[in-house]
Amino acid sequence: MTTLTIGSRFKGPPESGNGGYVCGLIATSLQADIKVRLVAPPPLDTPLELAPDGEGQWVLSSAAGPVARALAGRIQLDVPSPPQYVQAVWASQHYPGFREHAFPDC
């Protein structure tokens, strides 16, 4: 069993760890290619236990219950080509998230 703590500087939505950071933290801890499913908001600044479940998965848990489940595997993606420079500049200037965002602290 391993204890992991998500520092508040890695905040995602309010009072919750950033999902990508949490998944990366689990993968780094296990030193493996894994698929992770978040099943509850990951609490911040709280010791979480990462332990095998006996059925081929690892479970990250808080005192309240499971936070994430991980299993060995890789995600296969067809990565699209990047945009042209002019398109990227235009998109960066017109992205509405710079003016208003559902999770501005994320």
Predicted regions and their residues:
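Ser/Thr- (and often Asn-) enriched beta-sheet segments in non-cytosolic proteins
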Residues: 3-5, 49, 76
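Residue-level signal for the start and early helices of compact helical domains
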Residues: 1, 7-8, 33, 39, ...
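Active-site helix/loop of acyl-thioester processing domains in fatty-acid/polyketide metabolism
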Residues: 2, 9, 13-34
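HotDog/MaoC-like acyl-thioester-processing domains
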Residues: 53-106
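Active-site beta-strand->loop segment that positions catalytic residues and contacts the acyl thioester
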Residues: 33-55
